[in-house]
């Protein structure tokens, strides 16, 4: 995966769902109502390769100076505070949304997160209220048992680092972990996490 966090919005113009009406032998039901349609606009807010970057990295982007178009200014980028604010603003534009991490949310992370087994990143993402994390390769850096602990919570130690150093009641991720292509070694018919989840919008 590219070492770049990307935040983008995909707008689905129309989600149409047909209401299927069952049939039986009762003559009173011969005139069933026609299939109904309902349109919903859904924003998918997706990002990837966050890697526990809670603090802004020492990087800048050049942007036009609002006071002088001929000049530019250096603006610090990244960090979870900016990220959370961006998500909040995008959510406010449309309540029908899904916030999706497309992999490498954790691990290969800076000390502020990795020192605590990336528990701070999980808890911050809980506060931001992301919906799904499609686990990437780096989620498995510390093994499947530790990855499940981050999802389900608890303080069982699976690595050389002691867990729950900050929060003695670490409860795990409140969002779904997804993994369609990672099967269990002892039962290849089962994936380590669900392959998909369904989210409803406006009753659809």
UniProtKB/Swiss-Prot annotation:
Question: Which biological process terms from the Gene Ontology are attached to this UniProt entry?
Answer: nucleotide catabolic process
Q: Which GO terms describe its cellular component?
A: outer membrane-bounded periplasmic space
GO MF terms here are: 5'-nucleotidase activity; UDP-sugar diphosphatase activity
InterPro entries (UniProt xref):
5_nucleotidase/apyrase, Calcineurin-like_PHP_ApaH, Metallo-depent_PP-like
Tell me which SUPFAM superfamilies the record gives: Metallo-dependent phosphatases
Protein name (Swiss-Prot/TrEMBL): Uncharacterized protein in pqq-V 5'region
């Amino acid at each position: 995966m590219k070492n770049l966090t990307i935040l983008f919005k995909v707008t689905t113009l129309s989600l149409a769902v047909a209401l299927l009406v069952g049939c039986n032998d009762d003559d009173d039901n011969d005139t069933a109502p026609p299939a109904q349609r309902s349109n919903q606009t859904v924003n998918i807010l997706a990002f990837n390769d966050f890697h526990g970057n809670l603090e802004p990295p020492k990087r800048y982007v050049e942007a036009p100076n609002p006071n002088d178009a001929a000049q530019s200014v250096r603006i610090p980028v990244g960090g979870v505070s900016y990220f959370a604010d961006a998500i909040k603003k995008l959510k406010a534009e449309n309540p029908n949304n899904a916030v999706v991490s497309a992999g490498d949310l954790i691990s290969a992370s800076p000390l502020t997160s990795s020192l605590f087994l990336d528990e701070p990143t999980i808890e911050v993402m809980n506060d931001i209220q992301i919906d799904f994390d499609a686990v990437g390769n780096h989620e498995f850096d510390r093994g499947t048992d530790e990855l499940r602990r981050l999802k389900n919570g608890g303080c069982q130690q699976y690595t050389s680092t002691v867990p729950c150093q900050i929060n003695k009641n670490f409860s795990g991720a409140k969002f779904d972990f997804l993994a369609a292509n990672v099967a269990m070694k002892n039962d290849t018919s089962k994936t380590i996490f669900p392959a998909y989840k369904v989210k409803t919008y406006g009753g659809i």
